[in-house]
């Protein structure tokens, strides 16, 4: 599968079971179905579909902030069998484009210290670390908070 083979589209309620299955496959402390159900209206809750199956998703929101809205990538995963094919990068870029379109100026996210692949992707896309949060995850692992300025990101595209 190459990046052009995957279709990125807004999530639909019918996708939630597939999203939860990917969540459970990818994370040791997965979000429950109802958490995703509450997020259906987020501006950048997108899925990647390949050959009729959902293989990844991203959930990102927007919060007003005195004319410089802040986006937050809340959750992001690609099924292990669909990794290393550009699906994650395409999902992330699609979410950033959508957030920019609704007026978001800066996007932030948290990433596990041990998640080298994700940290590399985020660095490639212009995210910069701004702080470390000790014991952020339930298992005690630290997180890095990363941010990207969407005006700079879009200028670099």
Located regions from the model:
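Acetyl-CoA-dependent GNAT
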Residues: 3, 10-81, 89-94, 98-102, ...
